[in-house]
Amino acid sequence: EAMARDALRAMGLESFALRDVHTLSGGERQRLAIATLLTQAPQLALLDEPLSHLDLNHQVAVLDLFSRRARDAGLAVVMVLHDINLALRHADRALLLFGDGHHVIGPVAEVMQAELLTQLYGHPLRELADGERRYLVPG
């Protein structure tokens, strides 16, 4: 029970412990699914779009949480993200899957390049920098 309460707290859902799941919004259900995963104390988390239905503040909080768990508890995290700027901010490595079957994998700094992502998405992207942070925006 303590593990469940800790997971709910980590996701900002501690006051939802007694709520019927059917009364939760899509974002609240997504956060509950992540809390459920956390109670299992996995060594590997495979996450397909864990940020779907989440407001930006919750998206960043979830990514920060998984980054901390990876760093502090040795959790291996593999996730599908479509927000390239959040991936740039949080990922160590990236895998780009192209429609023709080829792929590019490697460190984020090498893989998440405007030229490659332009090919992937079929839309021009350009890179902006703000200090040490990089951002990719539509060209």
Feature locations, PLM:
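Conserved ABC ATPase "signature" region
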Residues: 1-16
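Conserved ABC ATPase signature
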Residues: 20-24, 28
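Catalytic Walker B motif of ABC-type/P-loop ATPase nucleotide-binding domains
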Residues: 45-49
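H-loop/switch region of ABC-family ATPase nucleotide-binding domains
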Residues: 81-82
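ABC ATPase nucleotide-binding domains
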Residues: 114, 118-139
